[in-house]
Amino acid sequence: MVKYTEDELLEFQEIAYNPQPQVLDAFNQMVDEVREHANAEIERQKHLKWSNGDTYIDENGNERPYHHLNRRRGSRSGAKPNLKRKGAESVTVDDDGWATLAKPKKSFGAEEAGEERTKFRDSLKDGSVKARPNNKNLGSSKAVDPRDAIADKNTISFNAFEALGDDSDDDDE
C-alpha cells in the first residue's frame, strides 16, 4: 500500500474527483465530532486525576470539586494549633500611669470557698480519719501486723564454705 504524507493528501484533495460530496462532508463532520469528544475525554481524565468526580455548588452557583477540602494526607511537619483558651488578661492603670496586669485565677472558687476550706481542715485536725480500703480484689481483709513482717526476714544465712572450714569443731567431739 502506498503511504502519503499529510501535505501530499492535501494537494490531492483539490484535484480529486468526488461523486458524492455530501457523504464526504458528513464523514468529515463525524471525524471532527469524534476528535472533540476525544479531547473532552482527555480533559475529563486530567480533571479526575485530581478529584474523585464529586463536586459541589459554591455560594456563587459555580460547580467546584472537593479536592481542596479532602487532601489525602495532611502535612505533619507544621506546628499544631494551641486549642487551650487563655482567659482575658485585664490591665488596670492607676493614677500615676502605672499599668498592672491581672492574670485570671486558675481555680474557679478560689476566694469564695476559703471559709469552707478552713472549716473542713479544722475538722480534720480535731479527730483522726479512718480510711477503709476496698478489699474486694485483695486476698485477705485481715490487717497486717508489722511484727510478722519483721519475723519473716532471714537474719542468719548458711555459708557452705564456712561449714567446710570448721571441720575441726565436729571432729573434736
Swiss-Prot record:
Tell me the keywords, alphabetical order.
Cytoplasm, Initiation factor, Phosphoprotein, Protein biosynthesis, Protein synthesis inhibitor, Translation regulation
Coiled-coil spans in chain = none
Instruction: List the signal peptide residues.
Output: none
For bias type Basic and acidic residues, the affected ranges are: 115-129
- Spell out the residue ranges making up region: Disordered: 49-91, 105-149
Localization (cell): Cytoplasm
Record carries keyword Acyltransferase? no
Q: Please, which domain of life does this record's source organism belong to? A: Eukaryota
Any single biological process term in GO: negative regulation of translation
Give the CC-aspect GO terms. cytoplasm
What terms describe the molecular function in GO for this protein?
Answer: eukaryotic initiation factor 4E binding; translation initiation factor activity
Q: What InterPro entries does the database record attribute to this sequence?
A: Caf20
Q: Does the keyword Lyase apply?
A: no
| Protein family membership | Belongs to the CAF20 family.
- What does the UniProt function comment say about this protein? Acts as an inhibitor of cap-dependent translation. Competes with eIF4G1 and EAP1 for binding to eIF4E and interferes with the formation of the eIF4F complex, inhibiting translation and stabilizing mRNA.
Name of the protein this chain belongs to: Cap-associated protein CAF20
Q: Which species is this record about?
A: Meyerozyma guilliermondii (strain ATCC 6260 / CBS 566 / DSM 6381 / JCM 1539 / NBRC 10279 / NRRL Y-324)
